[in-house]
Amino acid sequence: GHSHTELREAIIVNGRTQSNVEKALTELRRDLSSADLVGLAADNGTAGGCATTLSTWPQVDILVNNLGIYEAIGFFDETDGAWQKMFEINIMSGVRLARQYLKGMLERGHGRIVFISSESGISPAPEMAHYSATKTMQLGIARSLAELTRGTKVTVNSVLPGPTRTDGVEKFIQDVFPGLTQAEAECRFIAENRPTSLIGRLIDPREIGDIVAFVCSARASVINGSCIRAEGGLVRTIC
């Protein structure tokens, strides 16, 4: 999101492939011409990819664990392999990176870690039981790590977005509602699949970026061990 420029840090842009990284850098540089952007191609959904990332950048001041996959599939069709793949990518990627980066942050006495979870972490989706389970687990991991930061200026939090207009979500919605325009498909998706949403639309990725940027800033020093909901009010609970 654009707000990351307020942090005045070098931003490492990670992706699974070099082409994806270059595409992201091109888009970001168009909007963030003054930002210090560095690309890193490594598949952090694997142990080898995380090792590449950690050896290339042994320490960071801010870690945003945004890597994740999802798929809509009935519980009885979710194989052991599907569960294991979801766990390896959605959970172990963040665990492997945080294990090294958090240690360095604690030694230096400052830092930020943010896990990008999901509203499915507190409102599990029956058509994505394995995905929802990993998103719930992220909340527990983040809170456990936050307990290790006592007496430092390090914070560990989770942000829980609702349905967000990413490339993957747009394709998913078009596959579910073929023959409709993108706008029509999005409206239909919200009406039929997320009817409790108070905003009644998909979330712009920049809106999530703004929240993450604030949580990573010095102004958010009192926010630690928290689950920050950014799901447009679709979860009907008070806390």
What are these regions (language model features)?
Residues 98, 134, 142:
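Active-site helix of classical SDR
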Residues 74-76, 82-87, 193:
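Substrate-binding pocket helix/loop in short-chain dehydrogenase/reductase
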Residues 150, 155, 223-225:
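Short, small/polar-rich loop/turn modules that mediate ligand/substrate recognition or access, typified
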Residues 123, 212-213, 224-239:
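Short C-terminal tail/terminal secondary-structure segment
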Residues 103, 147-148, 221:
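Alpha-helical segment proximal to the catalytic Tyr-Lys
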Residues 76, 125-129, 151-152, 200, ...:
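Active-site loop immediately N-terminal to the catalytic Tyr-X3-Lys motif
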Residues 118:
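Residue(s) in the substrate-gating loop at a strand-loop-helix junction
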